[in-house]
Each structure stands twice: as structure tokens, then as C-alpha cells.
Amino acid sequence: MSLKKALDDCMIDFDRCVLVTDLLEEYKLSYKEVNDVLEAYIKEQEPATKFEKRFLVHGKRKTQGSDSGEDLYSVVLESRMQDWLAKVQDAESQLYSVKIAGGTKAPAAIFKPMQHLEVKLAKVEQRPGAGKIVPSANGTTPHNGVKSEPTKSEPSKSAVKLEPSKSSLKSEPAKSKAEKPVASKSSPEDKKTSPKEQASKAKPAAAKKGSINSFFTAAASKPKDVKATPSKSTSGTVDNFFKKQPAGAKKSPPESEDKSKKDASNSNKKEASKKKSPSPTKKPTTANTSMQLFDEESAESSDEEEKLDMLRRKVIESDNDSDQEKASSSKRRRISDSEDEEQPPKKSADEETIALDEKMDTEPANETYLDEDGFVITQRKPTKAQPANKKVSPKAAAPVNKKKSPPSAAKAGKDAPKTKQAGIMNFFSKK
């Protein structure tokens, strides 16, 4: 994009200070071309808008002790340019920056380095991959919103760089696909040899496990051979014994349950001893002898067991009925006993109140006696017994204490020895 087109399309914002050096850097033009285009644009816009211009003044200033003056460069406003030209010898002025007078935006930096011209003057070629490093002018873009042409060519470079990476990605899957069939070919050979190797590896492992768990495996295998269907009948009889008991039987005293269990065990032992003598066959011994007894009985005589089960059920049902009656009667007895136990405390409390009232009437409230020194002492009744009297009979106890306690009793009570008070307190606490 040319500078003239950018100015016509209002791509350059003059609210900020537009430096000529920026335009030289962006559009790669000579100073004369930029100056001519910019002055022509300002003349067109000047009747409507007022611009604030700055000029670069260059000249020589005389100093003491030197015939040739020093070079002086200064950026000056247009209003002060004539004064500076008069002060300096061989003065030259060039347009440096343009800005709309009274712009709302913050001012941009006045001085900026010109990398493009520095490279040209030093005759140094810039590295192709190096990007432009231009300081930002108060948060604004260095080119004043105008995009340079070389930046457009960057996407093409990146696309060219990405192409070899795509080809490498394509080549990698091809390699992986080529490796997969090789692995698949080798896998059947491994599968063919694997069962033999696994068998050879499994044998020592099994031997080790057998040495550790031989005891448990042997013990587990024997009961499996010995236990047959008749064992279910024995377990069923035990389960029926507990299942057929109603809810009331649980509440029956534990003594009746213990007696029934003992009777059942004794009857089983007697039957087993009778049936052991005629049995000619011998079965292999097992770890659990009690289970063996039940197995022999069930295997030899199944009909007799059924009869015995019927008898047991009848006995259990009769026991359950009696247990229910006993439980109901025991409940009633417990209720009556609890009522009897609750009543005596009430009677005892009433008796205690009557006894206390009698003591209050019979015994005097104050005791008068002579001390060892010959002083007359009146002992007042202890104050700790008053709350009990108030709880039992407040109306009867209060007036007795008020009537019989003279004012002198309080004074005398303080002088009484502690041993005598302790003896009286013990007397009332015991009763």
C-alpha cells in the first residue's frame, strides 16, 4: 500500500503525533518523497483542521576556544522555528512530525530509532528470520495502523515450513504399519511355544503352593467326599428346632432351654450307642467326630429317624405350649412384683413423715444445760433438718420452729462447741 493511498483512506491517525521517521520506516521511501506527499495532504486538510507541526533544525553554534562551531540538532515547534534559525549558523529545517492541534489522544513518542535506514547506512543485511523490534509508542502500533507488505509474506513461509512436518507425520505412520505385520508374524510363533513354557513354569509354582497349602487342601477335600445328602437331614433337624419356636419361646427363662438341649443330646447319645454294636461296616474317620455320628445314624436308619423326628416335634410343640403359658404367667408375676416393689417406698415415706412429726411433738426444739464454766447454754435444733421437714409437712414444722425459738437461741447456738453439734447432727442423720 502506498503512502498516498493510506492518507486518502484515512489509515493514518493524526490524533496522535505522526513521525516522518515512522513513515520512512514503513513505506521504505526517501525523505523527499514522504515530505512532498505529506505536505500536499496537509494543505488539502488545513482549511478544515488545524495541524501542529514540528521541525528538525540543524546548524552550527559557535563556542569559545574553537573556530568551527558545533553541530546542533533540535526539534522545534513551527512557532519557534524562526528564532532557532536566527541563533544558529548555516541552519536547515525539515518537517519532523505532524499532529492535529488539541487531539484527544495521548501524545506519542517524539524520537524513534530508524532501523531500516541504520541498516542501509551500515550496509548490513538483515537476517531473514529476525522480526522487527520497534518500541511501542504509548500503547500504539509503530506503523500507525498501516500494515507493511513484508508481513503478508510471513504466512507463506510458515506454510512452507509446515509441509516437511506433514510429510514426516505421514512417513511415521507408514513405518508403524510396516512394523505391525512383522510383530503379528512373530506373535504366532510365541503363541505356539507359550503353552509349553507356561506349563513348565506353572509346575514349580504349583509345587510351592502345594507345600504351603497342603494341609488346608487335604482338609478341604476330605469333608467333600464324606459329606453326603443325609447330612442335610441332621442340619435340618437342628434348624427346625430353632425355627419352629415362636416369639414367646425366646422370652422364656434360659434354664428351660438348657434342660431341653441336655435331654436332646442325651437321647441322641443313647441311640448312637445302641446302633453302633450291630453295624458291621466301618467308615473312614473324619476330623469332626460329632458329624460322623449323625452321618452313621442317617445312613443306617432313615425310617427310624423320621419317627424320632415326629416324636421330637411333638415334644417340642408341647414344650413350646408350656413355655408360652409359663412366659405369660411369669410376665404377670413380674408385673405384680414390680407393683409390690413400687408400693413399699410410698408406705415407708408416709411412715417416716409420721415418725418425724411424733419426734417433733415429743422432743423439745431447744435444749438448755450448764456448761463446765457454769454458763447457761440453749442448744438450738440444727438448721439442716429444716428442708426435710418442709418437704414432708411444711405447715406443721414451720410454726413449731417459729414459736419455740426465742431470739437468745441464735446467739447461744453460735457459742456451742462443735463436738456437741456434730453429735446431734449424727443423731438426726441416722434416723
UniProtKB/Swiss-Prot annotation:
Residues 294-307 have a biased composition (Acidic residues). Residues 172-200, 252-271, 308-328, 343-362 have a biased composition (Basic and acidic residues). It comes from the Eukaryota. GO terms for biological process: DNA repair; DNA synthesis involved in double-strand break repair via homologous recombination; double-strand break repair via break-induced replication; double-strand break repair via homologous recombination; mitotic DNA replication; protein-containing complex localization. Residues 156-171, 278-290, 387-411 have a biased composition (Low complexity). GO terms for molecular function: DNA polymerase processivity factor activity. Disruption phenotype: Oocytes and embryos lacking maternal PolD3, show no nuclear localization of the delta complex members PolD1 and PolD2, resulting in limited genome replication during the earliest cell cycles and thus early developmental arrest. Mutants, presumably with maternal but not zygotic PolD3, develop normally however adults display a variable degree of bristle loss or shortening, and females are sterile while males are fertile. In larval salivary glands, the delta complex localizes normally to the nuclei and chromosomes display a significant decrease in homologous recombination repair. Keywords: DNA damage, DNA repair, DNA replication, Nucleus. Residues 64-80 are annotated as: Necessary for function, possibly resulting from its inability to interact with PolD2. It is found in: Nucleus; Nucleus, Nucleoplasm. Expressed in ovaries (at the protein level). Expressed in ovaries. The keyword Metal-binding does not apply. The keyword DNA damage applies. Residues 128-431 are annotated as: Disordered. One of its GO terms (cellular component) is delta DNA polymerase complex. Component of both the DNA polymerase delta and DNA polymerase zeta complexes. The DNA polymerase delta complex consists of three subunits: the catalytic subunit PolD1 and two accessory subunits PolD2/Pol31 and PolD3/Pol32. Within the delta complex, interacts with both PolD1 and PolD2. Component of the DNA polymerase zeta complex consisting of four subunits: the catalytic subunit PolZ1 and three accessory subunits PolZ2/Rev7, PolD2/Pol31 and PolD3/Pol32. Accessory component of the DNA polymerase delta complex and possibly the DNA polymerase zeta complex. As a component of the delta complex, participates in high fidelity genome replication, including lagging strand synthesis, DNA recombination and repair. Required to recruit the DNA polymerase delta complex to the nucleus of rapidly dividing embryonic cells, and as a consequence is essential for genome replication during the earliest cell cycles. Increases the efficiency and processivity of DNA synthesis of the DNA polymerases during mitotic DNA replication and repair. This is DNA polymerase delta subunit 3. It comes from Drosophila melanogaster. The gene is PolD3.
